[in-house]
Amino acid sequence: MLRIAICCGGGFSSSTMAAHLNKQLAAKHLEDKVFLEFIPFANLYGDDSAFITGTHRDRQDEVDVALLCPHLEFDAKRAVDAGKIHIPIFLLPMRLYGLVDIENLIEEAEDVLELWNNGTPNIVTFPDEPRSIMAKRTVSHRRWIAQSK
């Protein structure tokens, strides 16, 4: 089973997105293949700011990959540079984040895991997208490459 965390700062947009994606999982009968959960980014790695919410514990072992809202770029870099992250994290491209459907999200997570397993360091990026926040695509990287051919 692929376990995916959807992360943002306060949870306003990503918790709604995670709920929407979980409905898609159920509608497509994918619950046995994919587990998707919203986890605020600070709670993912037990950052001190998580004391505010009372959830100061590292939750990285609960998921295989964390897909982050685009606005977390600098927070993610700080956490990686501090050595606090031991799972692959990926910043979703802005347009994909806004229009994401479950199939694109699953493909993105699978491909990020493959890159990570092949030695790509955090923050994981695709070779042709060194800064994913700048990507203009609205589909998974896999589909975007296929459409470009």
Summary of predicted features, one role per range:
Residues 87-142:
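Ser/Thr/Gly-rich flexible loops in soluble cytosolic domains mediating phosphotransfer, phosphorylation
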Residues 1-3, 88-89:
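Glycine-rich, often proline-containing surface loops adjacent to acidic residues and nearby aromatics
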Residues 2-57:
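Conserved active-site segments centered on acidic
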Residues 64-103:
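Mid-chain, well-packed structural core segment of small domains
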Residues 21, 25, 29, 83, ...:
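Hydrophobic, Leu/Ile/Phe/Ala-enriched alpha-helical segments that form helix-helix packing faces
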